[in-house]
A protein has these predicted regions:
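Residue-level signature of outer-membrane beta-barrel architecture
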Residues: 1, 26, 57, 71, ...
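Outer-membrane beta-barrel "beta-signal"
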Residues: 124-129, 159-173
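Solvent-exposed loop/turn segments connecting transmembrane beta-strands
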Residues: 9-19, 40-50, 70-79, 89, ...
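Repeated loop/turn-to-beta-strand initiation elements of outer-membrane beta-barrel proteins
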Residues: 1-3, 30-35, 61-65, 90-95, ...
Length: 173
């Protein structure tokens, strides 16, 4: 079972890009798992619930991949593809470059998302593994919104691209 939660806290008390998933995970080979479950988008925009079906695993050269397809109750479809690589600097320090792409089948004005390639996030995180299951991290991320998604951002007086400093805690149990 996987519980995934991601979002950005805004200075004015809101949440942006709040994405929460509960997924059942099953190994289908030595290197890959299939995941099925639900995703809920909760933030200052319109809430949306999705059914999720995905694959995650290890590609050659130890690149971790995650690809998930989503279908909502109102006929919207989406896909999220992510790649990252753990570069061990020492036994505890890990540098992790990563890239995530989000694609949508339809424009969704309530969520300020356009069809096609909606966003790309690329960055690098440095984490210190206190234990393998608990590691604080700090990093820098480039976030780009494209097409109609970028136009929605500009209508709200937001930038279509941004570079952000991120920090958090990575944990699993």
């Amino acid at each position: 079972m996987w519980l995934k939660s991601e979002g950005f806290a805004l200075g004015k008390g809101g949440v942006e890009d709040g994405r929460h998933e509960v997924l059942y995970n099953r190994a289908i080979s030595t290197w890959f798992d299939v995941q099925v479950g639900v995703r809920t988008d909760l933030d200052s925009g319109t809430s949306r619930q999705w059914a999720a079906l995905g694959v995650r695993g290890m590609l050659p050269h130890f690149v971790e991949m995650e690809a998930t397809a989503y279908a909502s109750d109102n006929g919207h479809f989406a896909a999220r593809i992510g790649l990252h690589y753990d570069l061990r600097l020492t036994q505890r320090w890990v540098l992790q470059p990563e890239i995530d792409l989000n694609v949508y089948s339809k424009t969704d004005p309530g969520r300020h998302v356009g069809s096609g390639l909606a966003s790309l996030d690329a960055g690098v995180r440095l984490r210190y593994e206190i234990t393998r299951k608990f590691a604080p991290y700090v990093g820098v991320t480039y976030s780009g919104r494209y097409g109609q998604t970028a136009r929605f951002a500009r209508q709200e007086s937001e930038a279509a691209t941004a570079v952000q400093v991120v920090f958090g805690i990575r944990s699993w149990f």
